[in-house]
Amino acid sequence: MAGNDREPIGRKGKPTRPVKQKVSRRRYEDDDDYDDYDDYEDEEPMPRKGKGKGKGRKPRGKRGWLWLLLKLAIVFAVLIAIYGVYLDQKIRSRIDGKVWQLPAAVYGRMVNLEPDMTISKNEMVKLLEATQYRQVSKMTRPGEFTVQANSIEMIRRPFDFPDSKEGQVRARLTFDGDHLATIVNMENNRQFGFFRLDPRLITMISSPNGEQRLFVPRSGFPDLLVDTLLATEDRHFYEHDGISLYSIGRAVLANLTAGRTVQGASTLTQQLVKNLFLSSERSYWRKANEAYMALIMDARYSKDRILELYMNEVYLGQSGDNEIRGFPLASLYYFGRPVEELSLDQQALLVGMVKGASIYNPWRNPKLALERRNLVLRLLQQQQIIDQELYDMLSARPLGVQPRGGVISPQPAFMQLVRQELQAKLGDKVKDLSGVKIFTTFDSVAQDAAEKAAVEGIPALKKQRKLSDLETAIVVVDRFSGEVRAMVGGSEPQFAGYNRAMQARRSIGSLAKPATYLTALSQPKIYRLNTWIADAPIALRQPNGQVWSPQNDDRRYSESGRVMLVDALTRSMNVPTVNLGMALGLPAVTETWIKLGVPKDQLHPVPAMLLGALNLTPIEVAQAFQTIASGGNRAPLSALRSVIAEDGKVLYQSFPQAERAVPAQAAYLTLWTMQQVVQRGTGRQLGAKYPNLHLAGKTGTTNNNVDTWFAGIDGSTVTITWVGRDNNQPTKLYGASGAMSIYQRYLANQTPTPLNLVPPEDIADMGVDYDGNFVCSGGMRILPVWTSDPQSLCQQSEMQQQPSGNPFDQSSQPQQQPQQQPAQQEQKDSDGVAGWIKDMFGSN
C-alpha cells in the first residue's frame, strides 16, 4: 500500500507522465478533442484505479458522488411517480365509484291533504310540528308556517317522493270548523285537489361500518355555511393545491413558540383524505401519505367536489353505536331541520364541532359548545362576513338544540316490525339496503302520544300500586287500512330490548268476549241484541273428571236468571258468555277468531277460551279488533308502504287491500255494543271523560289480575294497550284501572276523532220493551237490529219469547235454569284441557 502510494510522484525524471495523466482524465470528459492521444495511451496505459490520495483524484470523486445521487434521485422520482399512480388509482376507484355505503333512510307516512277532509286547524298545527315544521311570524324559507284566524300558510319543503320529485310550494290551507275547506297555491292562486306533505325522517338503518349520513349535493348546502366552514377551517381553500405551505409555516411557528402541538396545518382536502383513506395513526409516514394524496385529489377533482365530499363525510357526533357523519344528518340530529334551513348561529355550532365533536357536544358540554360557537361567529365578524351588530345578536342566542333523540330516534319496536316486513317482502334483497329510502306508515303524532302515555302512565301506576316492575305495550293501527301508526314495546320506548308489542304472548282475558258475541250476531235469525241469555250458576264436567264452574266477576247473578245479549257484553259478564259460547259451539267461535286474523296455532277449542284462555301478542289482538272496527273487513297489519332504491327503482310498493271476513251487519252490532261498554259499561270512566266521541272499547283482566288489557276504537284508529309484569305476577290492577288508564293518557296527548257509526244495509233501529219484545213505537230502549223487514217484527202477535231457534228460550217463569246438557255434550269432543283451569280469567 505504501509503495503504491509513493510510486506515481517518485518518478521525477519523466516530465511527460503528468501530461499523460492530465490528457487521460480530460479524455473521459471530452473524447472528441483528444483523439490524438489514443495511440500514446495504448502504448503505455495508466492504471485507472489508483489507491493513492493524490490531488488529481479529488475532482473525479465528487463528480462520482453527484452522479450516484442523481441516479438515486431519478430512481426515487420514478418510485414516487409509480406510487402516485397507485394512490391516484386508489382515490379514483372510490371517489368515482360508490364513495359510501349509505344507510337506509326510514321515513314516516306521507300525509295526503284534500279539500273537505276532516281535520281542524289545531290538528293541522300539531301535524306540521310533528313533521318538523316551525311556526313563525313571517315565512322566509321552506319548513315554516304561519297561523291566521281560520287558515295556515306554509312553505312545503321540496322532496323526492316515491313517484316524483316535487319542489317547494307556498300554500294556504283554509279551515271551516273541523274540516279543511280549501288548499290554494299562493304563487298562482290555483286550488289544489290533492296536496301532500313531505314525510318525516324517523330513523336510519345503519350501514355495516356503523356510519349514518344523508347525502346532499354541493348545491344543497347554503353558501353561508360553506363560508363559515372555510373561514374557520381553511380560509385559503380556493388558493392552495391541497396542502397549504402558509398554514404549515404558521403551525410550525405556533407549535415552536408554545413548546407543544397547539395548531394543526391540515387543509380540508387533507382532512378528507384522512377520513376516507387513512387511519388516525400519528406518524410521519401517514402525514406524508396524507399530503401526497391531497395534492393528487386537488389536481384530480374540482374544489366544489372536494367540498361536497367533505361536508358529507365530516364526523359530527355519536348516536349510540353509530357515527353521525356529515352536516345534513347532523342538522337533523341536533336541530330537527334540514341543513338548508339552519340559521347562521346553528351553522356556526356545527362548524365549531368539526374541531372536536365530543368536546363540543351541545348536550354533554353546553358551555364549551356555546363558547366554541361564539368563537366561530367572532371569526366571521373579524373576516367581515357579518357585522358587529349581527354578531352581538347571534352570540346572545342560546344553543337552541332539540332534546336528544327528538327527531332521529331508534324506534326499536316499530323498526322490528319494519325489518320483519322487509325480510318477508324483499327476501335476499334485504341484505343490501345501502342508500335505500323506506317509506312507512309511522305516524309521528300518534307515536309521540303513545310514548308520552307510557313514560308518564307507568310510573304513576307503579307509585299507586307500589310495584317497581310494571310494563306496558301499545299498538295503534289505522281502523280501515290496517297500517300500523305507532308502537311502544315497553315503559322505556327507546330501549332496544324486549318488544312486548310483538313478542309478549299473554292471556287476553275478557278481550276474547267480543268474538263470541260476533259469532252469535252473525246468525240474525237466532241471535239479536235483545236475545236473552242464561245467567245462573253452571258446572261443566271435563273429560278428566274435573268440574269447571265459571263465575261473574262480582260473584253475583241476575235476579231473573237471564240477561240480554247486549247487556252481557256491555257488562263483560262471564257466565252468560260461557252459556252463549257453548250453545254456539267452540268450533264456530274458533272459526270466527281465524276470520278475525288470529294465528290458527294459537287457538285451542276449550271452554276457557271463551273467557280468554288464548295467548296472543298485542299486535295480534290489534288485528282482530281492526277487523271488527272496520265493519268486518280484515286488512293485514302492515308498516311498510314502499321501498325505493338509490337509483330510483321501486323495490316494493304496497297496495293495502281489505277482504270481507265477517258480515258487515254483525260487525256493526258488535262495535255498537262496544260503544255501550264505554258509555255505561266497564269503560264508563272513559266515556265520562270523552262523552262526545262515542268511543268503542273493551276491557280485559286475566285471572289474579296478572294482565290488564284495553282495546280502544275512535273514528280513525284501533289502539291496544297492555299493562302487566314480565314475571307473570299480579298487578293489583283491572283492565279499567290499568290498561285503560294508559289509553286515556294516549288520547289526552293527541286529538281523537269521533266514532260516528254508519249502519250498513239491513240494519234498523227498533224499540224494545222491558221484556225485550219489539214494539212498533216507543219502547224502553232502542237497539239496532239486523233485519230486512223491521215492520213485521213489531207486528208479531206474540213477542213474549225469543224466536224458536234460540236455545235460551225461557218459559213464563224467568227463574227457570237453562239446560246444561248442550254444554256438557260439547265437552265430549274437547281435548287438551289439562292446565286450562289455571288459565281461567276474570271479567274485566
Curated annotation (Swiss-Prot):
Its EC number is 2.4.99.28, 3.4.16.4. GO terms for biological process: cell wall repair; peptidoglycan biosynthetic process; positive regulation of bipolar cell growth; proteolysis; regulation of cell shape; response to antibiotic. It holds the Pfam family Transpeptidase. Residues 1-10 have a biased composition (Basic and acidic residues). InterPro entries: Beta-lactam/transpept-like (IPR012338), Glyco_trans_51 (IPR001264), Glycosyltr_51/Transpeptidase (IPR050396), Lysozyme-like_dom_sf (IPR023346), PBP1b_TM (IPR032730), PBP_1b (IPR011813), PBP_transglycosylase (IPR036950), PCN-bd_Tpept (IPR001460). It is found in: Cell inner membrane. Residues 88-250 are annotated as: Membrane association. SUPFAM superfamilies: beta-lactamase/transpeptidase-like (SSF56601), Lysozyme-like (SSF53955). Residues 30-44 have a biased composition (Acidic residues). The UvrB domain 2 homolog region (UB2H domain) is important for interaction with MltA. This is Penicillin-binding protein 1B. It comes from Escherichia coli (strain K12).
